[in-house]
Amino acid sequence: TNYAFNNAMRYDISDQTTHWKVDLAYTSQVNYNYETPCLLEVYPEKAPGIDLAPNEYFKSVRTNELLMDSYDRQRRGLMIKKMYRTLAPWTTQNPIFMHLVSKNDQEVKNAIDQCVATGYEAVILSFGSHLNMEDSSMANIKKWKTLTDYAHQHKILLGGYSLFSSRRISDADDVVDIKTGKPGGAFFGNAPCFGSNWGLAYRDKIKYFFKSTGFDIWENDGPYPGDVCASTTHPGHKGYDDSQWRQMEIQKELYHWLNESG
């Protein structure tokens, strides 16, 4: 499905849209009480209130089914791999990269030189490095564009780490718990709402950074985990019932933009 989250790293756990129901009309089933889960319904469970503005279009959740013809584990694994290569070919893009915790620009250049010497394909500035993609100042953009150009001259990709969830921003921008009316209750405890002023600005800053520097890889730690938000003042969603859907759409649009931009 294209509506999956919760940080499980496994599609069968992260799938939020697959619901197996019973079918009382299926009277020939083995289960005496007709409770065999055999009727598949696909829908997002926590997105019941999506209002469309004039000229706005709605694109529903999409789920792909793969029919298995064997219990053989290896064959099933090959079938799943082929499905991903066909439906989501970008999942095959796995460059050999070095994770770097840099403290200055020279360490980045040294890592790029090491990658050239050892056959690595990319450098990713990791958590704790001196990279800040949310800094849109001219000085920061110029610095990282210079380093990106250096990497590209040596045919090395350059990327960086960015944390979205599991961080507290402010009462005005964090996810609001429906039970308390206050920030909190998110998947990671506290988390920003992607539909808040901060969340929308974060999206725009990431786009600006990549467009201005030529960076190649975005390592997004704690992407949107499906948090619902009860705020009625965030510009990116109306209220609780559309908050999950709208935040998911914001993240997907950002990922699509990055992929389309190379």
Regions found by a protein language model. Give the residues of each.
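Short, well-ordered coil/turn segments that N-cap beta-strands
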Residues: T92-I96, G119-E121, H152-L158, G214-D216, ...
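Conserved, mostly hydrophobic/aromatic
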Residues: N55, C115, A151, D221
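N-terminal accessory beta-strand-rich subdomains and adjacent acidic, glycine-rich linkers
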Residues: T1-K81
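Aromatic-lined carbohydrate-recognition surfaces of secreted/lumenal glycan-active proteins
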Residues: L158-I169, Q247-G262
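An acidic-aromatic substrate-binding cleft motif
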Residues: K59, R73-A122, S126-S129
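The substrate-binding groove and active-site-proximal loops of carbohydrate-active enzymes
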Residues: N94-D105, S126-K142, G184-R203, F215, ...
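Active-site beta-loop-alpha junctions enriched in small/polar residues
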Residues: T27, T63-E65, H99-K103, G128-H130, ...
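Active-site-adjacent "subsite" loops/lids of carbohydrate-active enzymes
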Residues: A88, K142-D149, Q153-T213
